[in-house]
Structure formats: structure tokens, C-alpha cells
Amino acid sequence: MQQDDKPGAKSAGKAWSGRFAEPLDSLTQRFNASVSFDQRLAQFDIAGSLAHARMLARAKLISAADLAAIERGMAQISGEVLSGSFPWSLEREDVHLNIEHRLTELVGDAGKRLHTARSRNDQVATDMRLWLRAQIDELTGLLRAVREGLIDLASKHTDTDRRAHV
């Protein structure tokens, strides 16, 4: 079987590429891609990846040089995401593949080693938990501000007559 005849050959690089003989239709690809939603997870994906890289280094699964390269690359990626200059691609489907690809562009093989001992499901679960925690913290702060505003308003109107509310 020639390379082009193998299932998934025309979709190389996709997580699902071994299952299909033909590339996905562009409409299906856009429908399946989660990049537009995932962009809000980028900083959490970076934080999770940095924690994972540090664990790999402590376990001696990657070298100190690899860890330094990953940290340097992730710092650059974080800056690109925050500035809006990160090169997002629908071809890479999600936040994880986009960041992993960019990291490998920046630091070479050290970026590929970051995937050691971690599944994409682990990444998704971690990113979502970190994002949700940040959202809860933000909502808690907003609720606290509303509560303080209501308390302040109530203290200013302790003598206000409210006959309709008996």
C-alpha cells in the first residue's frame, strides 16, 4: 500500500487521521474545530502544560534543558495569545494542538516531549477545571460587589419609610 493509499494519509497530523481514507470536507472541519471556543482556554492550557513539564523534569523524564526550553516557549506563546498575535489554525482543530505545534516550532523536540505521560483527555479536563475555577472566582467577586453595594444602600436608607413592604 502506497503512502497516499493508506487511511488518513491525506489528513496527516490529525488526531483521527488513521480512521479515514479521505480528508474531511472543509465545512465538516469547521464544524468539528473547537479553536474559536478553545481560545479562552489558552492561558489555562499553558499553565497546565507548565505544571506538567515541571513534573516531568522532577521525575527525570525530561532534562533541565528541555524544561527551560518549554518554559521559554510557553512564555512566548502566552505573550502572543495575550497580544492577539498567536497564529491560530483551524487545521490544528483545538487549543492543545495549536499550542503544541507552536511550541515545537519555537523549541524543537523539547516541545514534543511535553506530551509524555499525558493524554488529550487529561489536558481537556485540566483546562476546563482551571477555566471554571477562574470563572467561579470572577463571579464570586462580582456577587461580593453586589452584596456590598446592597449593604451600603441599605445602610444609607435605614430611616426610609417602606410602608408597601409590611
Protein language model regions, located:
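A helix-coil-helix interface module used to build multimeric assemblies
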Residues: 2-166
